[in-house]
Structures are given as structure tokens and as C-alpha cells.
Amino acid sequence: MRIGRSFGSCSAEGALLALLVIALIAATAAADDFAYGRRLYLDKAQCSYCHGWAADGAGETQSNGGAANLRQSFLNREQLIEVIMCGRPATPMPHYDEAAYTDNRCYGMTEAELGTSVPALPPGATLQKREVEAIADYLLAKFIGRGAVTREECEEVFGTGGRACSQYPAKP
């Protein structure tokens, strides 16, 4: 009888340990995905050039200007993916899908229908769908619908106590 109870106890402990391991693996994978999306946003796709490091539309002074403030956006994941893949016609927002507008995958329109309004393809920066998904997930986790930039967010990027971050308010 005691053996059965001990075995039952081990099973419960084993199940708890297995759940803990799964949670740890999931948390590590989420952190890796977040870092991957961030690298793509900042470096490969260079979204920050126009949208800014904090996705607030305050990009580099040399950019075309007028980039969307993604912090005020309420686009869902699918909408973000479409905008990144397809760009925004008649705006400086480029498309990152090499085959965009060759068929109706982008907003149900083709290049023939758009004429000169087809968004530009950024030189050397086409993205795979999984890369676009990683950027969308990063934006949703960090910026979409978040309101004003905070000092804490700035310090995550530029380090604690930096002069550049003093212009932002602390989190309430």
C-alpha cells in the first residue's frame, strides 16, 4: 500500500517538474523570439529609421518623416503582417515581400491596379514571412497601443541614467 502512495506522490512531483521545465523552455523561447523581432526591427528591416527606436514615429531626421506612431496603433497581428509585407500604397512605407503586388496578396490589389502608387521595395531588405511575424510579435509585445514613451523603456535601450532618457517621464 505504501508503495502505491509513494509512486502516486512521485507521479505528482514528476508532473509538476515537467510543467516547470515546459514553462522555463517556453519563457526562454519567448525571450529569444522577442530578441529576434527586436533585431529585425532595428537592424535588418531598419524600421526604426522611420518609426524610431520606440516605434513612436520619431525616426531619424534624414528619413522621409511622417511615419506612423505605432504606439497609438491598434492594428492586430494579421493587419501588422500585411502592412509590413505589403507596405502602404502612396506613402513612403516600403513593402518587404519580394512578390508583393504580383498577385492580389496585398490588400487584394495588383501592381496593374495601383500603377505608380506601388510602395517601394527597400534595397536588400526583403523579409521572409517568419521574420515579418517576429517583427509583428515584437511590436505587439512592446509598443502597439502603449501610449507615450517612458524613461524605463528608453533606459532598456540606452542604459540607466543616460541623458537621452531624461526627456521621458517615469512610468506612473
Q: What role is predicted for each listed range?
A:
Residues 25-33:
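Sec/Tat signal peptide C-region and signal peptidase I cleavage site
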Residues 1-11:
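N-terminal secretory signal peptides that target proteins for export/translocation
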Residues 32-35, 43-45, 53, 94-172:
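Flexible coil segments in periplasmic/lumen-exposed cytochrome c-class electron-transfer proteins
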Residues 54-117:
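Gly/Gly-Pro-rich "capping" loops immediately C-terminal to redox-active cysteine motifs
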Residues 10-15, 121:
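Low-complexity, intrinsically disordered segments with a bias for serine/threonine
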Residues 14-26:
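Bacterial N-terminal signal peptides
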Residues 39:
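Mature N-terminal segment immediately following signal peptide/propeptide cleavage
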Residues 49:
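Short, cysteine/histidine-rich loop/knuckle motifs that typically chelate Zn2+
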